[in-house]
Amino acid sequence: MGGIRGVLHHMQRTAVQASPRALGTITSRWVPGAPRSSGTHPFRKSLAELRVGDSVTAGPRTVTLADIEHFAEFTGDTFYAHTDEEAARANPLFGGIVAHGYLVVSLAAGLFVAPEPGPVLANYGLENLRFLTPVKPGDELTVTLTAKQITPRVDADYGEVRWDADVTNQRGESVAKYDVLTLVAKEQRQPDSSR
């Protein structure tokens, strides 16, 4: 077996060991444990300015019982773990009312999104979403968003950015982890002065 097929076949059995910083350099992807860079909110940076490892930490935001009840009523997701204290307490995983996972993700977005127009053009999805620790009323959420992979599109004025999102509670436990996928302008757009 020759060519790229042979190389890929061989690589399936190859392990690369290195520090997180070295792995990030080799793969052009941020990996947990690699350095993060803060400063300017990364959603304010164009693709040309953005670097793997650019990061923002936002929060805390306290989750209230009213938040959970409103989300259940508004979305129609009235699963008993979010609405019935007695039944939720009997569940061995929860021990009482817990927040919806999608409420946690929505609150995290509310913490890290920069609302003004800028180089981030669109959020086009989430991948690898996992809910790791139940969130109860009174828990405080903080989110760290880190540029994980930057992929310019050859045929467009924007590229794709994959962000590592880690939502933690007041004890530093990860409650949700996922990748946020965005489309980001290659260059800062100038405001339209004709208005």
Where are these regions (language model features)?
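Catalytic strand-loop segment that frames the active site of acyl-thioester-processing enzymes
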Residues: 30-99, 186
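Alpha-helix N-cap/helix-start motif at coil-to-helix transitions, marked by capping-box chemistry
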Residues: 2, 62-65, 102, 106
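General structural feature for long, well-ordered alpha-helical segments within catalytic domains
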Residues: 67-70, 104, 146, 164
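HotDog/MaoC-like acyl-thioester-processing domains
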Residues: 2-52, 135-140, 144-195
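Hydrophobic beta-strand-centered segment that forms part of the acyl-chain substrate-binding groove
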Residues: 91-99, 103-149
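Charged/polar, solvent-exposed surface patches and flexible loops
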Residues: 6, 13, 70-73, 110
